[in-house]
Amino acid sequence: MREGSFPRRTRLLCLLAAVVLISTVTSFNIDTKNVVLHHMANNYFGYSLDFYNEQKGMPVLVVGAPEAETTNPNLSGIRRPGAVYACSVNRPTCREVHVDKMKGNLKKLNGSHLVPIEDKAYQFFGATVKSNDKHDKLLMCAPKYKYFYSKFEVIEPVGTCFYAENGFEKTEEFSSCKQEPARHGRHRLGYGQCGFSGAIPGKKNQDRVFLGAPGVWYWQGAIFSQNTKNQTDRPNTEYGSKEYDHDMMGYATATGDFDGDGIDDIVAGVPRGNDLHGKLVLYTSKLKMMINLTDEVSTQHGQYCGGALAVADVNKDGRDDIIMGCPFYTDYGSVKDAKTQERKPQYDVGKVIVFLQTAPGVFGKQLAVVGDDQWGRFGHSLAAAGDLNLDGYNDVIVGAPYAGKNKQGAVYVIHGSKDGVREKPTQKIEASQIGHGTARAFGFAVAGGVDVDGNGMPDIAVGAWKSGNAAVLLTKPVVTVTGATEPESALINVEEKNCDVDGKLGKQACRHINTCFKYEGKGDTPNDLEFDLRFNLDDHSPEPRAYFLQKDVKSDRSIKVASGSKTRDHPSSIEQRVRLEKGRQKCFRHRFFASSTMKDKLSPIHWSVNYTYVESKSGKLRGDKLEPAIDTTVPLSFQNKINIANNCGKDDLCVPDLKVTAVADREKFLLGTQDNTMLINVTVQNGGEDSYETKLYFDVPQGFEYGGIESVGADGSAPACSPTSDEPDSDGKWTFACDLGNPLPANKVVSSVVRVTASSDKPPLAPISINAHVNSSNDEEAHTIADNKVTFTIPVDFKNQLSLNGRSNPEQVDFSMTNKTRSDVFDDNEIGPVVSHLYQISNRGPSEIDAATLDIFWPSFSTEGGHLLYIITEPVVNPPNKGRCRVKQLQNVNPLNLRITNEHVPTEPPVAKTPNEYSREEDDESYEDETTTQSQTHHQTRTEHTQHHQGPVHVYERDEDKIRQNTGNWQYVEDKKKKGDYEYIPDDQEYDGDDFEDDDEDFDRAGSKRVKRAPVPKKKKKEGSRSGEPRSDKARFSDLREAVKLSKEAGGVVDYKGPLSRASVDCNGLRCTHIECDIYDLKEDEFVLVEIFSRLYTNTLVDERNPGGDISSLALARVTSTKYNWPHKPTLITAVSTNMNAIASEEGRDLPWWLYLLAILIGLAILILLILLLWRCGFFKRNRPPTEHAELRAEKQPAAHYADTQSRYAPQDQYSQGRHGQML
């Protein structure tokens, strides 16, 4: 079966259902063009109405206007007593009926004065107008009529009614609630409002009327059976217990035979009964209680069931059925919100319940018809309309006074049927269709059952009190059309081209279809009528495969191309106007051809023929007769089909055996790799008979994009594939359909490769489900369908390997334990040799790393607080577009403000940047600005200092007090918007002396001995750190030492699960420097180098008599983010160590130069004094003996040695650009 389609049998059933639906919706025979519309303004004209035969065979429409000023001379001077009008059914004329023969208000002697005992002002006369089934008796009531009881002190609305027979000449007044002596009061009959509703029995029981009085006995309500010939014969229903208070029984009444005795009984509506659900109470003609009827279909509080009533035999079983209105019913299930698809309540749509009498006194079946317009109050009024369409079943009209356009009101026609009533109204008449469309509250009152124009069809009347209208709507006669359409032959072979279509298409396969019609009439129907026929070829197919011949259309003037035809040259739909004679069949013959290039050669070619009656603008025929209406209880169209010849054998049934297999080119899909394409090998095989319109369907999983399909093998081309819809399904999957053949022959194998590519924006994160299935337009046998579908799952993984390496340059530094540099140094090269630690963090793949962190803990100070590895510059990151570093304790970078000689800077040219790297630098502009701001915070101004030195030297002014006192540190602090800056934090907020109190060794010099130091005094602890984290979460010095030890024992990098992290290590109290580096966008085999340059502060080693050992920095690296939030692997740690080698002391001492000069001068002075003394003594004047040759040995003097810092501690080879520029 094809994706998204139904089997042929199912589609045919759907078509038949559509035909029934069309007949249900469009059927009507109430004429809206020739309406007799009566109008009177501002008096509630149309509040009630009914037909009444004033004279035999001469019906009038009696309309109540309960707010009217009467023209009755007997009621002169009484304000708005109300009036009843007799209106013509043929033209818009009315006259008031004077039924009250009493002169004004009745008066009675009260002492010596005559005083009124009644009040007819505002009595609402005309609120109830009701006739019997034969429409020869009439009841007219004033429910607000007031009576003054015997003491003249109590005035209560007892209500009154007038009864007429055979005209209006003789009338009787009945006020059943007006009873003496003293039955007044709300607890009795005083507020009864007799005549609020009324009903006149039609079967036997001819001398009585039933009056509803909903206000008696605390508004429990009652029914009075008033004898029309005896005023005092007026029995009523009994008083109930207080739980029935305010039920308002008698709000509506109707009569019918409910016990099978042939005498009309009474049914009363109780809209507030049954806990406000509403109910009906049935009494016999003698007012004996029979049964209660309640809504069992969809009951709800406040629906006001029983607010309107009608009685009719709707299913023609000979028993009277009851129709009950529930105008305030709310529909919670029919309407859905267009966006959310949630069901929306439709308030006050109203509904009608039909109680079918299945046996005498037994109502065993309920049917419900629900309104279609919110606030419309469908079921506010009801009337038995008779058999409107002459199908043998009585119909019902329902008023909805606030439905339709602009809430002006509407009337619905519900047809009876053998099952009761039809599920939906057959006609909806809106106020906008009547007259000029000005009626309001149209449908507040309805009446029917009288043929007023003599065409044998009962007509209806509708009241609209808000606009003061009453309308008489005539019923049109009914025309029933029967017919059939048949093919010339049962098959068409598209390869047998037997007719010439045109020069372009040449010859094609042609066939004829024959269609026959005739009509019969119900009522006064004409002998001949015009109909429009519409022929639709191949109307089951999205694209037609069969067409009418253009030359045939042009040759017949009665035929034209139908509007909506998908083609014009050779149309698939045509229209033809024909004239039929009543009772005579007429046939038509049309030729069509089937396209030889059609794809679907298995499905039959269906066609349909629809017919409609051609109406005139006036809606009338010759002789001023109403036009007929089409009977929609029979189909409005006829259908048939013709099969296409194929290779399916004698049974004309091809049964394929399709099978599909699929396999992916990988067992696991890795995210974040360069290769994001997956291939799915799909093979389809047909092991049965020919498979027509064979299609392969496969799902492109969520997170993938379709990349095309290729055929495997040299004998076939790639199938054409396209998505089945414009949007993915609810799971984000796209379904593609591929044509594999029409037909796909038996034993044919089709192999294809589907390429899908993972989306870069939203790649797959869950296991990938691969679904594929194959289908065709012909059905397979049930036991072979299982292999038409294949489903398998491919797991998704994310795999990257973070690598961390480091080394020291140089690996060993020699220093002398006896030689110190001078303390007043100014250049960085005077404090000791350069020591740099280089770290490399890399991704060994295969998946990408979105973000990683590298945290380096640097040994800036010794245990005694002296400078150790003195950082001279901020860390160098290479390549700069892959990471950035910041020193958290920025004051530890060149804290003595020495001139940086830049001897550590390599001389090689910088690494060339790609355009993408320049783009990255532009993106990081905000970070550079931040860094500049930090730098300006600590180095606010720069001046050039040239005293005692050659060339410019940069000196930075700092907060000397803070640096000298070492009372605090600079920390990087982020606000809520993730923007940050460095702030100065005093030590008393961060430092905790407990971190060192029990430690004997520093992590940067593991294994070396030192002089025991004095304990550091403890400072007051804070409850928490600046970030709000508890102090117990901070790492201790021992954690750093153990991490260094762990790395050394492992000989390099180690997976670390200890307490150290970026947040837990606080270098402010551990005499270290925390360097935070953020690394990003590392693809496979990419790396980042981070190098920290420092100088070994040799004076600290000499002062602390350190015999040597290792100085170590510690680095932590971890993946913090991937593109797909995959679980991260453990943290890596490694320690980089520099060995300090203490060398033996040299002879001599380093003495100041002035001591040497002083010694020379003293020696010279002594020599001069000695010469003068010898000269004075005449030493040089004595006779000298002969000269002897002798060797004078000079006295040994201690050699003076001077420390040359640059030559001893900073050999030139340590500054070679090769060593400091080399990368691992």
UniProtKB/Swiss-Prot annotation:
SMART domains associated with the record: Int_alpha
UniProt-recorded Gene Ontology molecular function terms: integrin binding; transmembrane signaling receptor activity
SUPFAM superfamilies: Integrin alpha N-terminal domain, Integrin domains
UniProt gene name: pat-2
Membrane topology: Single-pass type I membrane protein
Sequence ranges of Basic residues compositional bias: 1008-1023
Role summary: Required for muscle development probably through the regulation of the actin-myosin cytoskeleton. During the formation of neuromuscular junctions at the larval stage, negatively regulates membrane protrusion from body wall muscles, probably through lamins such as epi-1, lam-2 and unc-52. Required for distal tip cell migration and dorsal pathfinding. Required for egg-laying. May play a role in cell motility and cell-cell interactions.
Motif (Cell attachment site): 622-624
Transmembrane residue ranges: 1154-1174
Subunit organization: Heterodimer of an alpha and a beta subunit. Alpha pat-2 associates with beta pat-3.
Cytoplasmic side: 1175-1224
Annotated region (Disordered), positions in chain: 898-968, 981-1037, 1190-1224
Extracellular topological domain residue ranges: 28-1153
Protein name: Integrin alpha pat-2
Keywords of this entry: Cell adhesion, Glycoprotein, Integrin, Membrane, Receptor, Repeat, Signal, Transmembrane, Transmembrane helix
GO cellular component: external side of plasma membrane; integrin complex; M band; striated muscle dense body
GO terms of biological process kind: cell adhesion mediated by integrin; cell-cell adhesion; integrin-mediated signaling pathway; mitochondrion organization; muscle cell cellular homeostasis; negative regulation of epidermal growth factor receptor signaling pathway; positive regulation of engulfment of apoptotic cell; positive regulation of locomotion
Subcellular location: Membrane
Record's compositionally biased regions (Polar residues): 1204-1224
Family in the record: Belongs to the integrin alpha chain family.
Signal peptide, first to last residue: 1-27
Glycosylation sites: N74, N110, N230, N292, N610, N681, N775, N819
Keyword Membrane: yes
Positions with biased composition (Acidic residues): 920-931, 984-1003
FG-GAP repeats: 29-96, 110-173, 180-235, 236-292, 293-347, 364-423, 427-490
Species for this entry: Caenorhabditis briggsae
Biased composition (Basic and acidic residues): 955-964, 1024-1037
Highest taxon above the source species: Eukaryota
